Amino acid sequence: KSALMTYEDAETRFIFDPIECLKRPYAEVQSALIKYRVALQKDKQTEIWLKLCETMVELWNGDIRKLFDECDYDVNRIRKFIQIDNKKKFPYLSGTKICNYWLYVLYQYTNIRFKNIEDLNVAPDTHVVKSTHKLGLISDEELTSSEVQTLAIERWNELLKGTEFKPIDIHTALWLWSRNGFRSLD
């Protein structure tokens, strides 16, 4: 919703054009990012946004779709490029949580058709981890482990293997359930 409102506003739409974004003063980019809450941490996330814009301009003349084309629209190849081969060029986006969810959102809400979409893991943010624990898929001891995100990914992959569901499909439901205090639906 925040991204859509930002895109529909002629004054803030420029943030989705990496070349145009890099031409603007820092304060203008920051203002556009926070206007509809695309960025919640104004300094840190503005820096990250600008770094991602620099990377996209440097590698693909500002068109991220060229990455998808180079990787044959294969989520595994795209993740390897972002998370392993070029991690430093993709701050935040190269993380386990965001990279999977970003690719999922692009798949769900655009006309992009990725290959191997079923390989996207659940994005193990705080809320997903809490929900995974609440459901008994990770123990109290595992909840405090430094490996809890990896464990959450593994447990959901195991549980959903051989079903019609992809692990990333459950992200939003788990996130909302935890975010709303695990309220009952009845």
Give the residues covered by each predicted segment.
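HhH-family (HhH-GPD) DNA N-glycosylase catalytic core used in base-excision repair
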Residues: K1-D186
